[in-house]
Swiss-Prot record:
Its main location: membrane. Na(+) is not transported, but it plays an essential structural role and its presence is essential for fluoride channel function. It comes from the Bacteria. This is Fluoride-specific ion channel FluC. Na(+) binds at residues 79, 82. It comes from Renibacterium salmoninarum (strain ATCC 33209 / DSM 20767 / JCM 11484 / NBRC 15589 / NCIMB 2235). GO terms for biological process: cellular detoxification of fluoride. It is a multi-pass membrane protein. PANTHER family: FLUORIDE EXPORT PROTEIN 1-RELATED. Keywords: Cell membrane, Ion channel, Ion transport, Membrane, Metal-binding, Sodium, Transmembrane, Transmembrane helix, Transport. The lineage of its organism: Bacteria, Bacillati, Actinomycetota, Actinomycetes, Micrococcales. Disulfide bonds: none annotated. The chain crosses the membrane at residues 1-21, 40-60, 72-92, 104-124.
Length: 126
């Protein structure tokens, strides 16, 4: 049963990611597939996912969240939402297009904001 629960949560995470990608694409600033633009949608889903998994981990460490719910949220929702591969491809594409500064900023922001969001989630759940 947990497998189905995690799978359904993964669908929710993927739909959340699609929604955020669509939000940025509709504004015309970061159109899908245009690597020369800063990948703000990818940054957003990775930071949000880091916060969600931090929050879930914090609640699970205090036994306020069952292992099944922790798996559904961490593996399903956060796993379906976040994307390391898109981050990697966008960063390499920026670099190859000569936008080395943007590529480095993307790496820095994903690390700093992602770690900060995970810390915030863990702290709020404490």
């Amino acid at each position: 049963m947990i497998v189905i629960f995690v799978g359904l949560a993964g669908v929710l995470g993927a739909l959340m990611r699609f929604g955020l990608d669509s939000f940025f694409a509709q504004r015309g600033r970061f159109a899908h597939g245009q690597a020369h633009h800063f990948p703000l949608a990818t940054l957003s889903v990775n930071v949000l996912g880091s916060f969600i998994i931090g929050l879930a981990g914090g609640f699970a460490s205090h036994a306020e969240l069952s292992p099944d719910w922790h798996s559904a949220i961490s593996i399903g929702i956060a796993g379906g939402l976040t994307t390391f591969s898109s981050f990697a491809v966008a960063t390499v594409s920026l670099w190859q297009l000569g936008n080395k500064f943007s590529a480095m900023v993307n790496i820095g922001l994903n690390l700093v904001l992602g770690l900060g969001a995970a810390w915030l989630g863990l702290s709020l759940a404490a």
